[in-house]
């Protein structure tokens, strides 16, 4: 089956069409802007899968309807997912703009004095606003000379931010969310909303009963040689934690081996269901070999599966990580408890950064006073105002241990193409696999346990659906916190100590939901959240309006908020603008 091509970025150089001197004097400068933009994007960006980003430049500068149509014809067969229009001069607004209603688009108007690039930018954006096709504005802060071919830092930042978000939009379009199972324990996010996926993300939902996973395991619809490789890998790399179950619920060596085997098989089969696997065609399972074209998935697990079969913790943790028995590779996106809305936040984070995502319960707010009462320890530093305990039953990406290192030696999580095998091994070495607690998981399983290193910048996100309003996005930038070991042990043992932990301190603003740490916890819209490495809230804020999803809560500096220019016409308060504009334009793929 032919592999689906990755979306490309199109660069549209537009020009003043007046011949006999005007156009001729601008051709080289205009095309050089397009080439410089393409060079920047191809050098600085990659797809989440690690592949190089490709840019397609119009064959000619665009002065009017005919050349705009020729450009569009070229792009239509190149799988263009977003467009950037560039110009140093005046051009004819409605005659030259990109009119595709679902493709993210930006316009860079050169800030120079010789020709009025800013005038075209304003004129073209006015057309976009009037026609209901929002576009992003890019205009350098400082005037440049006409022969200056450099891209200023502020322009570069907007080009890259727009492109990252636009590629995320284009990469999700046409893919599917694999809903493996149904509603888990009444969790709202696992009431999978097909209209949300179709209308806002351009995706389909593939609903599959968990009996399909059982069938694939029981009928050996998998690569048996790969299973042996996975078992060998686990035997080499897995460290096992204590079994906290009562004696009557503890499994012997043979039973534990069977649980491990099935857990690894679950990972293999869920991956095959998402992506397909040509090896299955070799055993006459052609239909199953195709997969479901899923860019994200969720596994219900509890309780209809976990009351009798091993839980999904091991499978989900491995799939969400950047490595397995096949080595370092792109992490998948698999949501615990089929929480599709948290899965979408994971998907957004992965597409924006290329990194693995940490799925977690937003479990407990610990005030400084409560911690001092319980442990005798006084919080300081990043944790001085209190912390939030992020913990889930062992399905978080193992990258979340932060045993990878950046160029300065700091703990981090990296895109898979930057991760060494030694760093993958370090993440595995930092993880223990603890037998699942019988009271929760009667079918057994193994939960991963690690502790995230402190001082690492993270962005916590969540998508919620509000009846009458639609989807909204929450964003909280902050840091992981490292507590003294004895303090961590006391706090951790008050909950389930067999699960992975991140102590999180959000950055406070003193206002609204970020007045204090308690307010962050109190305003979080659901029981789950996602950690994405870095302070990348601004990228989420740029992605959200492309899909027409308003941001209901964030602590990103106002100077970093970058949305389509038409948002400014929806009032003077930038967050109210966001709600009114998203309501006005409606979901990107209106249904």
UniProtKB/Swiss-Prot annotation:
GO terms for molecular function: arabinose isomerase activity; L-fucose isomerase activity; manganese ion binding. Pathway: Carbohydrate degradation; L-fucose degradation; L-lactaldehyde and glycerone phosphate from L-fucose: step 1/3. Its cofactor is Mn(2+). Keywords: Carbohydrate metabolism, Cytoplasm, Fucose metabolism, Isomerase, Manganese, Metal-binding. GO terms for cellular component: cytoplasm. The active site is at 337 (proton acceptor), 361 (proton acceptor). InterPro entries: Fuc/Ara_isomerase_C, Fuc_iso_dom3_sf, Fuc_isomerase_C, Fucose_iso_dom1_sf, Fucose_iso_N1, Fucose_isomerase, Fucose_isomerase_dom2_sf, Fucose_isomerase_N/cen_sf. Pfam families: Fucose_iso_C (PF02952), Fucose_iso_N1 (PF07881), Fucose_iso_N2 (PF07882). Mn(2+) binds at residues 337, 361, 528. HAMAP family: Fucose_iso. Gene3D superfamilies: 3.40.50.1070, L-fucose Isomerase, Chain A, domain 2 (3.40.275.10), L-fucose/L-arabinose isomerase, C-terminal (3.20.14.10). Converts the aldose L-fucose into the corresponding ketose L-fuculose. Its EC number is 5.3.1.25. The keyword Chaperone does not apply. CDD domains: L-fucose_isomerase (cd03556). It is found in: Cytoplasm. Belongs to the L-fucose isomerase family. One of its GO terms (biological process) is L-fucose catabolic process. This is L-fucose isomerase. Transmembrane segments: none annotated. Signal peptide: none annotated.
């Amino acid at each position: 089956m032919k592999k689906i091509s990755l979306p490309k970025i199109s660069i549209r150089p537009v020009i003043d069409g007046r011949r006999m001197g005007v156009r001729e004097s601008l051709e080289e400068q205009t095309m050089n802007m397009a080439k410089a933009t393409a060079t920047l994007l191809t050098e600085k960006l990659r797809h989440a899968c690690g592949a190089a980003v490709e840019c397609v430049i119009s064959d000619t500068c665009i002065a009017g309807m005919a050349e705009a149509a020729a450009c569009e014809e070229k792009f239509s067969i190149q799988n263009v997912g977003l467009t950037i229009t560039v110009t140093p001069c005046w051009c004819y607004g409605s005659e030259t703009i990109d009119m595709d209603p679902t493709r993210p688009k930006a316009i860079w108007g050169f800030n120079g004095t010789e020709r009025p690039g800013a005038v075209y930018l304003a004129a073209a954006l006015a057309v976009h606003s009037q026609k209901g096709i929002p576009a992003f504005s890019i205009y350098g802060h400082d005037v440049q000379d006409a022969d200056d071919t450099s891209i200023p830092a502020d322009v570069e930042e907007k080009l890259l931010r727009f492109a990252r978000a636009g590629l995320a939009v284009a990469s999700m379009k046409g893919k599917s969310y694999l809903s493996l199972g149904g509603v888990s324990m009444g969790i709202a996010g696992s009431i999978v909303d097909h209209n949300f996926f179709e209308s806002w993300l351009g995706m389909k939902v593939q609903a599959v009963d968990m009996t399909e996973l059982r069938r694939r395991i029981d009928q050996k619809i998998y690569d048996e040689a790969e299973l042996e490789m996975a078992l060998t890998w686990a035997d080499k790399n897995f460290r096992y934690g204590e079994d906290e179950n009562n004696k009557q619920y503890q499994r012997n060596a043979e039973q534990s081996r069977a649980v491990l085997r099935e857990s690894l098989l679950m990972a293999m089969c869920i991956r095959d269901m998402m992506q397909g696997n040509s090896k299955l065609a070799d055993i006459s399972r052609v239909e199953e070999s195709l997969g479901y074209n899923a860019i994200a998935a969720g596994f219900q697990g509890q309780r209809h599966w976990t009351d009798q079969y091993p839980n999904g913790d091991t499978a989900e943790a491995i799939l969400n990580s950047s490595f397995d028995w096949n080595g370092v590779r792109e992490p998948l996106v698999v949501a615990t408890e089929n929480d599709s809305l948290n899965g979408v936040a994971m998907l957004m984070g992965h597409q924006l950064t290329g990194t693995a995502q940490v799925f977690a319960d937003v479990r407990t707010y610990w005030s400084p006073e409560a911690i001092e009462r319980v442990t005798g320890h006084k919080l300081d530093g990043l944790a001085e105002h209190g912390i939030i305990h992020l913990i889930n039953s062992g399905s978080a990406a193992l990258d979340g241990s932060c045993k990878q290192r950046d160029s300065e030696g700091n703990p981090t999580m990296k895109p898979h193409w930057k991760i060494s095998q030694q760093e993958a091994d370090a993440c595995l070495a930092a993880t223990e696999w603890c037998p699942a607690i019988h009271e929760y998981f009667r079918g057994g399983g193994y939960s991963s346990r690690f502790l995230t290193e402190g001082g690492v910048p993270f962005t916590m996100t969540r998508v919620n659906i509000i009846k009458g309003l639609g989807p909204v996005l929450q964003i909280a930038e902050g840091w992981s916190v490292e507590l003294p070991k004895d303090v961590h042990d006391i706090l951790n043992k008050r909950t389930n100590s067999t699960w992975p932990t991140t102590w999180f301190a959000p950055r406070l603003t003193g206002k609204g939901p970020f007045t204090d740490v308690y307010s962050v916890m109190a305003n979080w819209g659901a029981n789950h959240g996602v950690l994405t490495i870095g302070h990348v809230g601004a990228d989420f804020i740029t992605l959200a309006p492309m899909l027409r999803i308003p941001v209901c809560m964030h602590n990103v500096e106002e100077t970093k908020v970058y949305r389509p220019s038409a948002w400014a016409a929806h009032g003077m308060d930038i967050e109210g603008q966001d709600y009114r504009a998203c309501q006005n334009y409606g979901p990107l793929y209106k249904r």
